[in-house]
Regions:
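Helix-coil boundary/capping segments in enzymes
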Residues: 1-108
Length: 108
């Protein structure tokens, strides 16, 4: 049976390494990932986990950051991860629809 994980998050290294700096002004991120024990994965860690668990592919979801610059960087991260792991990681970009410039980021 083909197993696909339909909702995973992977994060840019700068978010994984400096999680605390991303908490202010980002209540959703703080709620889900503010606890240092909350697991965050890079693309390489995610693919290794897929391999270990026999999962064929995963839909990698960006995070709906309020800060549009951070959202762009995260979208870039998941697009690059998908390009590096074709057929394994399927990107799903995210943007806060109320953020100024959100439409341009969504179209990109």
């Amino acid at each position: 049976m083909l197993v696909i994980d339909a909702h995973v998050h992977l994060f840019p290294d700068e978010v994984v390494c400096a999680r605390e700096s991303c908490l202010e002004g980002e209540p959703c991120f703080a709620e889900l990932f503010g606890d240092p024990a909350a697991r965050m994965a890079s693309a390489e860690q995610l693919v290794a986990g897929l391999d270990a668990d026999g999962v064929a592919a995963a839909v990698t979801c960006a995070f709906p950051w309020r800060d549009l610059g951070r959202a762009r960087a995260h979208n870039d991260c998941i697009l690059a991860a998908a390009a590096a792991h074709p057929g394994r990681l399927v990107p799903l970009a995210a943007v806060d629809p109320l953020a100024p410039g959100a439409a341009a980021e969504a179209e990109r």
